[in-house]
Design a protein with these regions (language model features):
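Transmembrane helical segments that form the transport core of multi-pass membrane transport proteins
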Residues: 66-74, 100, 254-358
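Hydrophobic mid-bilayer segments of alpha-helices in multi-pass membrane transport proteins
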Residues: 9-27, 47-65, 80-94, 145, ...
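Transmembrane alpha-helix boundary signature
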Residues: 60-76, 90-109, 132-144, 312-320, ...
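Helix-loop-helix module between adjacent transmembrane segments
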Residues: 91-97, 114-118, 129-141, 173-182, ...
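Interfacial loop-to-helix junctions that mark the boundaries of transmembrane helices
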Residues: 1-9, 41-49, 70-85, 200-210, ...
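Juxtamembrane and boundary regions of transmembrane helices in multi-pass small-molecule transporters
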Residues: 3, 7-32, 162-165, 169, ...
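Hydrophobic transmembrane alpha-helices that form the pore/transport pathway of multi-pass ion
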Residues: 121-177, 191, 348-366, 388-411, ...
């Protein structure tokens, strides 16, 4: 391990504090209730999406004080903020009413083909079909769609806290592994696919079919486990009630923008321009829109941007730690490390090392996506789902420990799929 600079040491300490803060947001929300005079600041500190942006700002202030204005600005400009920008844009577009209408119609049509309890079938599809769809529309888009539809259907009813946490745990894990059918949808795969020459055929053979099995098993298991509660829920809101009738032309235009943004996902100058045109279109045809989720998407982008800034100073300890592992150790090491850092950062650091075996590369990426549902910071789409669903939990917050416990069983299924199949 190389000797760290003072800035790197400070960044590591701030990173640890940010992770601790992430697991303490429930406490700040509690303080907001018992100290109403300062409720505003406690609510701010209780927003998970604010955590990494806040500590990233503190890091930049340290760099400014210790190294000067030039170094602080140079470091910021050296960071790549394409992913936060993309997640912001894709969340807003995928969360529009016409897109939700379209996906709801597809899910409903598929559910009607299955002669079983329609509530359970639709729930299963939201946790299985939509995450796998993420391989083609990107994981952030799939997370946004699944979370919004779950919020408007299941989470809008009087259901148990156990079902809520179990659903979020399976959703986060399935989104993380469900994007591995293609080389462009999952952030940890995207970071290495071009350099390691991984195409769709490679992904399907080494990841895709295993991930699909794990996604199906996880969705089926949680559906079966809570089957009695589904039967007792007071008329679970039918999925068709999520959507109003939207003209086909409007749906097609929204899909057109969604596809273009996905195609140009690596070119912010293009997809941000498309997004501005999209905002103009939604303003012109406001009667076919529900309010855009701009606030939620901006908070998620702020979270990811903070992670980019803080994560950029962690290479000095993280990369040697990974490289000292063998194939088996790196799989489980990456799964565990993903819980405390972004899985795309792990695979990116791995891609900087030359001479890795193909088995090591596969194990690193498989471990990174396997652990992607354990915490809110583990996978880039997680803050989007967190932001959308948290209002339906007690004190409008998803407890990080509750998420961790709920995500462990589906994570173990993913471990079995990638290591035993």
């Amino acid at each position: 391990m190389i000797d760290p600079t003072s800035i790197q040491l400070i960044a590591a300490i701030l990173f640890a504090l940010a992770i601790t803060h992430t697991f303490s947001t429930k406490y700040f929300e509690h303080l907001a209730h018992i100290q109403p005079r300062h409720a505003g600041i406690w609510h701010l500190l209780g927003e998970v999406e604010v955590v990494f942006g806040l500590w990233a700002m503190i890091l930049i202030l340290f760099i400014f004080v210790l190294s000067g204005k030039h170094d602080a600005i140079t470091y910021l400009e050296s960071r790549n903020f394409t992913e936060p920008m993309f997640v912001f844009v894709i969340m807003v577009i995928a969360g529009t009413r016409p897109i939700l209408d379209f996906v709801a119609a597809v899910v409903q049509r598929i559910a009607m083909l299955v002669p079983l309890n329609q509530r359970m079938v639709m729930y299963f599809l939201l946790l299985a079909f939509v995450p796998l769809l993420g391989s083609f529309i990107t994981e952030p888009a799939a997370m946004t769609l699944a979370a919004l539809m779950l919020r408007e259907t299941l989470f809008s009813r009087d259901i148990s806290t156990r079902l809520k946490y179990a659903t979020v745990g399976v959703l986060f894990v399935n989104i993380s592994i469900g994007g591995t059918l293609t080389p462009f949808a999952a952030p940890p795969v995207l970071m290495v696919a071009a350099k390691w020459n991984w195409d769709i055929a490679f992904m399907l053979v080494n990841f895709g079919w295993k991930a699909a099995i794990a996604v199906m098993v996880n969705a089926l298991a949680v559906t079966w486990l809570f089957r009695r509660e589904f039967n007792q829920v007071d008329s679970l809101k039918d999925i068709e009630s999520v959507a109003n009738k939207t003209p086909l032309s409007v749906v097609l235009i929204h899909l057109f923008f969604l596809v273009l943004v996905v195609v140009f996902a690596h070119h912010p100058v293009v997809f941000m321009g498309l997004f501005l045109f999209f905002l103009g279109y939604t303003a012109a045809y406001e009667r076919h829109q529900s309010p855009l989720i701009l606030r939620e998407a901006l908070l998620v982008a702020f979270f990811l941007a903070g992670l980019v800034v803080l994560g950029g100073q962690q290479q000095w300890w993280l990369q040697p730690l990974l490289m000292n592992m063998n194939e088996t150790a790196v799989f489980f090491g990456a799964t565990a490390l993903t819980a405390v850092t972004d899985n795309a950062a792990l695979t990116y650091l791995g891609s900087l090392v030359e001479g890795l075996t193909e088995e090591f590369k596969i194990a690193l990426v498989a471990g990174a996506v396997t652990g992607g549902g354990l915490t809110v910071i583990a996978n880039a789409p997680n803050p989007a789902g967190f932001s959308i669903l948290k209002s339906k939990f007690d004190e409008q917050s998803i407890h990080p420990l509750g998420l961790l416990v709920a995500a462990i069983p589906p994570t173990l299924v993913a471990v079995a799929a990638f290591r035993m199949l």
